[in-house]
Each structure stands twice: as C-alpha cells, then as structure tokens.
Amino acid sequence: VWRTKAKYDDSFSFTGIDFDKPYLLENIEVVKKITIHEKMDFWRKVMQLADDRGISMYIFHWNMFAYGAEGKHGITQDLSNETTIAYFRAATREMIKQYPLLKGIGITAGEGMDNKKTDDSNERWLWRSYGEGINDGLKDTPNRDFRLIHRFHWTALSKITDNFKDLHCRLDLSLKYAIAHMYSIPNPPFINDAFPMLSEKHKTWLTIRN
C-alpha cells in the first residue's frame, strides 16, 4: 500500500482522467506490505461482517479507467482495444467468483469513455467487458442472488436493454435524482425528463449524493 508524499494541486479534471499523475509516484512511502491473497481475505471478512448484519455489498465502477494496469500487457485506455476488453471481462469474472457474498456490481457509461456520441459503442464495450464477465462469473452458480445496476448516465434505455438482453442476472437501473449534491436544490427537476423512459420491467434506484 503506497502513499504519496507529494502535495496535490488543483489541476485534476472533474472527468476523472489522469488521476495517477507521474509526480505523485515520484515521492512515495510504503504504508503496509500485503499480498494479493491477504487483500482478498480482508475484503471477504468485510463482506462477511456486512452480511451478518443484513447489509448487502455492491461495487460500483465509473468507466472506463485502467489505473494501475494501463501500459501493462497491452492494456490501454482505447475502447477498441481487445486486450483491455478481455482484461476487464476476466477481472469481473474473478471478482464474482472470489467474493461469493458480493451481491452485485454497478456500471456507468461514464467519463472515461471517448465515444459518447457515436452509435452504441459505449454500451457495447460495457456488455463485452462487464456483461460477459458477469455471465462467466455466474456460470457455475446460475442461481446466485446477484444483480447488475446500470447507471442511467450518458446513455439510453434502449441501448442498455439491447446490449444486455443476454445477461444472466437481474438488471436494475440507477438514476442520480439531484445530479449534484442533495442540498444544492430543493426540488430537483432532472428526473422529470427521465420518467417516460424508465421501464416497469426494471427496478430503478434513485441515488442521492450527500
């Protein structure tokens, strides 16, 4: 586990790009040495503590970001890179298999994707990485209680349902009710335009940022 000694500046993008700036890695200290298996055991214990108390744990992803993996084994930030797609698919599969108490994952057609305005390339990428990865991970446990929560962000319901029609688990939607923080406006109007597009077939989570 590393921690940088460098001072953070205010040049970081709100899109989440370039958060692993080189200067941050030039002056680091090791906080703790821990193996990957010890890390996995730690999170299994956390999930067990949550499950014992009736708390369901989900992992949400803002896509796509390859921090820590970019530049290794041919992995890049390019949506068309088959190696990157295979990497995310395999990572999703193994996460599901290694954490049996994980109840689901959430995904976003978000800031790290460079084709927001073209066809359904974002959704196709999400399906080929996370969608196929979920199916792979549930192959040996098809009756497992697991769901995918797809954020209704920079996408459309038709693109989600078309691309994820072969998903082997429950598909829910998620919408940011207030877009910004919950106290920024007393009567958020943003959901009004989304209501007609939401489907009765899919549960929709209204999320609020505090």
Regions found by a protein language model. Give the residues of each.
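Catalytic-core regions of glycoside hydrolase
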Residues: 1-4, 8-11, 36-40, 52, ...
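Acidic/aromatic-lined carbohydrate-recognition and catalytic surfaces
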Residues: 31-56
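Active-site-adjacent "subsite" loops/lids of carbohydrate-active enzymes
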Residues: 11-31, 56-93, 109
